[in-house]
Swiss-Prot record:
Source organism: Diaporthe leptostromiformis
Membrane topology category: Single-pass membrane protein
Alphabetized GO MF terms: metal ion binding; monooxygenase activity
Pathway terms, separated by semicolons: Mycotoxin biosynthesis
Subcellular location: Membrane
Keywords annotated in UniProt: Copper, Glycoprotein, Membrane, Metal-binding, Monooxygenase, Oxidoreductase, Transmembrane, Transmembrane helix
Name the UniProt record assigns to this protein: Tyrosinase-like protein phomQ1
Role of this protein: Tyrosinase-like protein; part of the gene cluster that mediates the biosynthesis of the phomopsins, a group of hexapeptide mycotoxins which infects lupins and causes lupinosis disease in livestock. Within the pathway, phomQ1 functions as a halogenase, converting. The pathway starts with the processing of the precursor phomA by several endopeptidases including kexin proteases as well as the cluster-specific S41 family peptidase phomP1 and the oligopeptidase phomG to produce 10 identical copies of the hexapeptide Tyr-Val-Ile-Pro-Ile-Asp.
Amino acid sequence: MFSLRSWRYTALAGDEDDLEGIDKKAFLASPLRSSSLRQRNQPKQLLLLLLRTIIVVSVITFAAIIGCWVFLSHGTTTTNPPQQCSTPAVRKEWRSLSPSAQAKYISAVQCLMYLPSVHKEGTTLYDDFVFGHSKTGSYSHYAASFLPWHRMYLHVYERALRDHCGYSESLPYWDWTLDSHHLSASPIWDPVTGFGGDGNPGGAETLHGGRCVVDGPFANSTRAWRALSEGHNHDVEYGPHCLSRGFIINNDDRTTLEMLHGLVSPSRVAQTLDKPDYIAFFEDFESGPHNAIPQFIRGDFLTFSAPNDPVFYLHHANVDRLWWLWQQRDPAGRLYQVRGPAKDFRYHEGHEVSEGSIEDVMPMGGLAEDIKMKSVMDTRAGFLCYEYE
């Protein structure tokens, strides 16, 4: 440690050692000697003052830098975003894919349904994604992380298709605004080039208004996990059952069907995209267009075990696309903008829920390493590298 006292003592000791043969007492007491010492000490004192000034300025500067970093890290933007990729993959709408590309995707999904689970014996890798979605439900729904969490979830699912099943293309999406006049007639339900259609109208109800799907590539497929209930309960139980759907049609409830069609119409989605900030956008989106699809399909799709239905991933890819479009309207202000409760405020009703932050770590339910929200805000930065056509 630097010591002013030891520095001055060393300087004087050297001077006295050089006074051999001289009356030291008289010399040290003389005005000439005193003046000489003061003059010789002046540069050293100036140096000391300069060092003190440098130290003080450095401390203040460092404190200011730390203060700015803390402020920015708790805000909605970041000054050092990850480097963007130069050749992003392009996610395309389902009906724009060639029949060959559609078949490759369906085949990869079927592959996941035959690979063994890493969590529970007797279930599949596909089932693990259903369980993980439910396990993290209170963090990934009606919360600030709703959109970022599902973006990461889709990335992990897409990576599983590639790593385990040889899929080489991008995850497709279903733009349901194109079918808002007649959801049940969408080509997504085609038994040959799609995912099969409604549940068997003459069959027994399996769960939540749904019946076994009996056509298409997933006809009579067995799913391992079922939700304990609709609504706020995120829990699932092991309960093998057939993939189930129960479309709302005119004969069921014409008024409800018209309302659901309206929620996914181009004009209604345009209103959502016009929302000025993140919390207004995600709240309007989640409770409006996003929820309309599960309420139309019903069955597995109506609960937190919704990923039992392979169409779920195309639905949420479209949700991600619309968020991406909203971000692209003002990248500087929106790419890293997040706001809302840290957890599902419905599930924690009556309890104080903290504000979500871009620094929050999102639990991924064992599907991947837990990750900070800020890592998935930009689809062309970091490990993400995609955009939408």
